[in-house]
């Protein structure tokens, strides 16, 4: 794409009747990295602000005794607060991990609170259409990392619910957090391969656009850093992009200052692939915590019942504790997920300045 024409090529992101003036989704980041402060600020700029529901109520009173209740309360609170900050601009959504134990409750709370979009990954969201009626106003999207996964979820939704995705998020191998790839794939996948995967997914969804008589926008995620990356995604046929890591080093991000500084200080060689108790590889910053996990299992002192498939007696560490420690500012002894380009982040900015730089 000719960068001189870049601005004229940036179209609004239209998800049915819901419209974001800027085709940028701020990716959901948990625990507590993207809540109402960040999501509301992104929506206010005309983008799609996304709240992560993973242990979102970690700082609510009584969380240690009642995680489910605190999380439900916090989902409502943060969606409403983000919408207030947005002032009627952009869209406010949630990212809900399929691996969560209270997945259905998180979806229902998000719909009731008025989320515009529900994005769901860390597993295939097979039952999402059953939890979100077509008339409720919330739009649904699976996160997929392969054409195979896209075909599978679209086929299942069509067969089981006579319904299709409102949009699709394609998350590539350069993303942060949990990744839909094997360790081997992450070591050997070059960009050319993945561009082809994106093109195949775009072709695959065409069948369902025809069947259901509607456009299914595609949003590309993973390693999107600057205008050139956005232009490249649009050239491949995407309708928008999802960016997460870059929004961490903003004043509005909901993480502690120490967490944001860890991103600013990070170098390319500090990034590594780890195995998560969720059962997927993840990309994170190497620190004391990761070195300790490599040496020995970190016994789980308290189980937060956060994951559907987790045996606290066997997992290498408690992911809830590790992520909460990090978001609160203990950046050496907590888990800091990040995208592959975190080493390119050099300074603190604001959501407004970052979006101006990207558009």
Per-region residue spans from a language model:
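Residue-level detector of alpha-helix initiation sites
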Residues: 33, 224-225
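Active-site entrance/lid segments in N-terminal catalytic domains of soluble metabolic enzymes
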Residues: 2-211
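Conserved active-site-proximal phosphate/metal-binding subdomains
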Residues: 25, 175-219, 225-359
